[in-house]
Amino acid sequence: MPAKTVSHLNFETSISTETVPASPYIPGSGNVFAKFVDAISQTGWELWYFDGVSKDDQSAISIGINRSARGLEHGGFTVQIFAIWPDGHTWHRDLYFPESTVTSEDGHITGLWEDAGSGGKVSFSVTRDCSLTMLTFAVPGVVDGTMHLETLPGDSGLETNPELGPRAHIVRPKGRASVKAELSLSSGDNSASERFVLGPSANGGMDRIWTLDTWPKVMTESYYLRAQVGPYAMQITRLFSEAESGCKPYTMARLYRDGKLICAANQVLTYEEQDFSKDSLILSKRYDASSEDVVTGAYRDKNIGYVVEFVAKGTDGQRWMFQVDHERIFWSYPTSAPGPEGTGNTGFIESVIGGADEEAYFGVGIGGQCQLS
């Protein structure tokens, strides 16, 4: 890549009716620079995602900075911001910006989503080695503040397979990070803004995802989890493909212990399957209709959590098992018409317990489950 490269998209002029290929995946890199450099198709999508959750008070923040045609009716590229305070109350805004610029200069990446008319902007800056990331928010009357992510020592996992099935890529430039944030958030109803502070006990990370297709053509269902559990850090994205291809399961899941990558799963198994030729993930939902104290999503799927099992390759492969419980609703919005069979996208603050053999480490994370059909 040249010393300086700029990708500038204007929402009115850069959405193409033709297929626009993504730039190639760069092995061993965070792939932070834009994959759709000069234009993006009506179905293409790429995401810069940042999150953090406090193990002490379960406050959390989630930021999704998008390039896609999704915000067509609003005239801009979407930035989603979710926050949850220690007492469980939440804040969410979808913001739209007509201009998106990503710049690479000597390997240092900056991104700017901007509305010159209103003066609103959201930006991020990532150092060449992906060790430090800073986000800045300046949208008058809505959000003002910063978020910092600093990579934790140890393996990066960037040399592993990024494919999430045949149609999507996911790279974690900062899979494990300490996170701090301080923002002023306004509800827009003339009430005083609220101060949101995350840290210093918060962990999280940064993901990069891109696909040529809209999500209904990529998947029917997905689950996402990033959690720190004692010495373990885990990152999971598991989806089922669209119905026409048989709802096949795919994953990009990683498990670390004390900063060392110990399981890199791109294969999904059931408990009955015995294919131990590669690192694998077993992920099953948990249900409990008898208890009134559990937390579930508001839509068709009423699971109360998951059982996560990482399996190292080899017939004598090490196993690590974790139980995930939904603790708090972080976000919730529908993906279908309302009704008893309605589907949706729900974010959770997750409590996680487990480890290897008889270990029972405890931790917290951010989970997100989405059903489209």
From Swiss-Prot:
InterPro entries: DA_C
Major enzyme class: isomerase
EC number: 5.5.1.-
Pathway: Mycotoxin biosynthesis
GO molecular function: isomerase activity
Pfam family, one: DA_N
Inactivation phenotype: Results in the production of reduced, though significant, amounts of trichosetin.
Inducing stimuli: Expression is positively regulated by the trichosetin cluster-specific transcription activator TF22.
Family under the similarity heading: Belongs to the Diels-Alderase family.
Protein name from the UniProt record: Diels-Alderase
Species this protein is from: Gibberella fujikuroi (strain CBS 195.34 / IMI 58289 / NRRL A-6831) (Bakanae and foot rot disease fungus)
